[in-house]
């Protein structure tokens, strides 16, 4: 028999998440504390984090919020203001336990007057050798009447001991030689410097976009998780020409959250250099998967992005968003 307990605050569950089957920093309530208190008022965005216990042992956790829309309708969202949400399970979770956890969630949300539940779990590779257990979740959600609303195609490189130059496309090898010719140098920095953020901001502005996080947001995340955020930089003649900001979301998974460069220096191939720099660092630091992020806009493929990431021997994983009407 499993029981559900509600947490109306973002407490630190780092120990449980770090030892779980599939948890990431994105699902850790502590991570969500980087948001300023007034950004999401509790009256409209009520914290509803669910803990599930079996014989006083924490077996599952679901982070989320009940969002009250202008119409008065209530929607439960997991994640809320984060990249991934969904359930975090202890490593020995069984099918019947997942079934009960989902059933308890739905019953509780109905009591709260919630009309819809939105869940976006992590990729199956976040469960490593037991990632297939995510199929238990998908099956039970669909058994309860949930639908897949959107799907994103994420490209992920599985790290091995094989020489990187043998795994990447021949054109990438040529471009990397180009980087050597122009004396491109690299640096791996813990945290995010102002110069790196300024280049990120200007790079995204070229596409009419702004970064998801402000510089202050990233500094706060670095304070909360000082050993989880890295910037991979490339330089030409001492000038910063490109970078990748990576989140170490698990001990063995690196998520390349931001990829950016200076358009006027693209002839030096900073992105090629930085992708290779990230994969080399991953090999040397016990990383098993490098998540290069989405390469689609829902069901619209971003072909150049897919082709580019394929050249770095990236494989496809699906990021699914489920909706269950209550």
Regions found by a protein language model. Give the residues of each.
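The substrate-binding groove and active-site-proximal loops of carbohydrate-active enzymes
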Residues: 84-94
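A conserved beta-strand-loop-helix scaffold within acyl/acetyltransferase catalytic domains
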Residues: 2-72, 123-149, 154-265
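Aromatic (often tryptophan-rich) hydrophobic motifs at membrane interfaces
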Residues: 99-104, 220, 224, 228-326
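Conserved beta-strand-loop-alpha-helix junction that forms the acyl-donor binding cleft
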Residues: 119-132, 292-303
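Conserved acyl-donor/pantetheine-binding loop and adjacent beta-alpha core of acyl/acetyltransferases
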Residues: 67-86
């Amino acid at each position: 028999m499993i029981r559900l307990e509600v947490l109306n605050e973002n407490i630190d569950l780092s120990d449980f998440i770090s030892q779980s089957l599939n948890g990431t920093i994105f699902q850790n309530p502590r991570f969500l504390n980087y948001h300023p208190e007034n950004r999401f008022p509790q009256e409209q965005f009520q914290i509803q984090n669910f803990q599930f216990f079996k014989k006083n042992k924490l077996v599952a956790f679901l982070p989320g919020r009940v969002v009250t829309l202008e119409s008065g309708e209530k929607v439960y969202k997991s994640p809320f203001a984060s990249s991934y949400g969904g359930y975090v399970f202890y490593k020995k979770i069984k099918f019947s336990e997942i079934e009960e956890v989902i059933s308890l969630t739905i019953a509780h949300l109905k009591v709260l007057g919630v009309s819809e539940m939105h869940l976006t779990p992590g990729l199956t590779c976040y469960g490593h050798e037991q990632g297939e257990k995510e199929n238990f979740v998908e099956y039970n959600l669909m058994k309860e009447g949930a639908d897949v609303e959107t799907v994103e195609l994420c490209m992920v490189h599985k790290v091995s001991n094989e020489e990187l130059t043998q795994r990447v496309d021949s054109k990438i090898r040529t471009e990397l030689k180009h980087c050597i010719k122009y004396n491109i140098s690299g640096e791996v920095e813990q945290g995010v410097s102002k110069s790196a953020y300024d280049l990120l901001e200007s790079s995204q502005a070229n596409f009419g976009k702004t970064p998801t996080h402000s510089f202050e947001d990233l500094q706060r995340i670095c304070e909360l998780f000082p050993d989880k955020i890295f910037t991979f930089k490339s330089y030409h003649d001492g000038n910063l020409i490109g970078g990748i900001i990576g989140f170490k979301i698990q001990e063995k998974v690196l998520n390349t959250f931001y990829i950016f460069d200076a358009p006027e220096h693209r002839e030096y191939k900073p992105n090629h250099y930085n992708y290779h720099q990230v994969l080399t660092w991953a090999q040397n630091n016990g990383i098993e998967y490098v998540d290069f992020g989405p390469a689609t806009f829902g069901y619209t493929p971003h072909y150049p992005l897919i082709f580019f990431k394929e050249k770095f021997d990236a494989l496809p994983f699906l990021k699914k968003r489920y909706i269950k009407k209550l």
